């Protein structure tokens, strides 16, 4: 088979549909196709020709291949999905900018991109597939947006360069083997929203400390799996046993510094305590809630954080 025309009624092309069709040189895909899964054209002359034209191969809004990219890459605005395996074993990739038009990232999209050091996932992304960053040994920082509701199986397995991760409170589950063999991981902040964690999610993370609230699922999980747990108190950054103006100052200082690109000066546990609204980041909203909380307590109103956040 040297050429193929996809009929107009087709809306999706499945995983590995034309994998290793070694004679395929021409293909016509109609606009009706809105979903293209992983490895669809891998090992075809057609894909090789497209890679020579542009290392980012995009079809109908889906980035299907970037495996020949090197250095820092910017995905163009308008791309809505990154297909499974799009950057599979792309060892020359060092950085990538993902536009807010992207809503999904497929299985193994960045599998074994060993030179990738940092990635920020925009809050437009609502789903990430299994193995999405598996084997990214050079990855030292990952920002997970609060649009994500689950961390998939094997998502960050063998990311040995990761040391700290904060899970946003939009997430309800962490998949099996999600951080397995990420041997450098020492701190992970898990919010109360997480009620399911795979039994092997943190296998071989021998120096890991799970941070969370007392009585949370995270605490129960840590104890059942022999992982050290550290509780943090909402808003109490200096561990004084109360939330006061000192905690507000530390939070404002952090927000101001981060806004101009400087280090915030807070530890992982302090950041977790400062994130009073559980958004996964510390910002001016947290400062407002802390000031409101302190003001109410200052006039004798013994309100809880739940009551403050409900305002």
Task: Label each region the model flagged.
Residues 232-311:
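Cellulosome-associated attachment modules in secreted, modular CAZymes
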Residues 35, 218-226, 279-284:
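Extracellular interaction modules
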Residues 14-19, 38-40, 84-88, 106-111, ...:
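Consensus positions within tandem repeat domains that build extended binding/scaffold surfaces
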Residues 16, 46, 50-69, 108, ...:
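Extracellular adhesion/carbohydrate-binding repeat motifs centered on closely spaced tryptophans
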Residues 197-199, 219-220, 299:
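Extracytoplasmic/secreted cell-surface and envelope-processing proteins
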Residues 44, 217-232, 303-311:
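A recurrent domain-boundary module in secreted/ectodomain proteins
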Residues 1-12, 21-35, 44-60, 67-81, ...:
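Structural signature of tandem-repeat unit edges
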Residues 61, 133, 147, 156, ...:
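Gram-positive cell-envelope targeting signals
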């Amino acid at each position: 088979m040297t050429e193929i025309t996809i009929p107009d009624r087709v809306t999706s092309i499945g995983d590995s549909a034309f994998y290793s069709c070694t004679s395929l040189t021409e293909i016509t895909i109609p606009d009706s196709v809105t979903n293209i899964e992983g490895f669809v054209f891998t090992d075809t002359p057609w894909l090789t020709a497209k890679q020579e034209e542009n290392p980012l191969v995009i079809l109908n809004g889906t980035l299907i291949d970037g495996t020949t990219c090197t250095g820092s890459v910017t995905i163009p605005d308008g791309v809505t999905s990154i297909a499974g395996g799009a950057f599979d074993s792309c060892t020359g990739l060092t950085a990538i900018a993902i536009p807010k038009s992207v809503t999904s990232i497929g299985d193994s999209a960045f599998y074994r991109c060993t030179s990738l050091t940092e990635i920020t996932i925009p809050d437009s992304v609502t789903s990430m597939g299994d193995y999405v960053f598996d084997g990214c040994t050079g990855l030292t920082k990952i920002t997970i947006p609060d649009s994500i509701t689950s961390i998939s199986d094997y998502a960050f397995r063998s990311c040995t360069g990761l040391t700290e991760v904060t899970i946003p409170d939009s997430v309800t589950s962490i998949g099996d083997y999600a951080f397995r063999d990420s041997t450098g991981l020492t701190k992970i902040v898990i919010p109360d929203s997480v009620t399911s964690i795979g039994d092997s999610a943190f296998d071989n993370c021998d120096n890991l400390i799970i941070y969370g609230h007392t009585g949370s699922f995270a605490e129960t999980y840590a104890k059942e799996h022999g992982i050290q747990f550290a509780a943090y108190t909402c808003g109490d950054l200096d561990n004084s046993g109360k939330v006061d103006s000192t905690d507000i100052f530390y939070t404002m200082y952090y927000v101001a510094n981060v806004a101009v690109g400087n280090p915030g000066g807070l530890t992982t546990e302090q950041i977790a305590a400062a994130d009073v609204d559980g958004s996964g980041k510390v910002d001016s909203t947290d400062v407002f809630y802390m000031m409101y909380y302190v003001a109410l307590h200052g006039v004798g109103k013994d309100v809880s954080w739940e009551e403050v956040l409900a305002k």
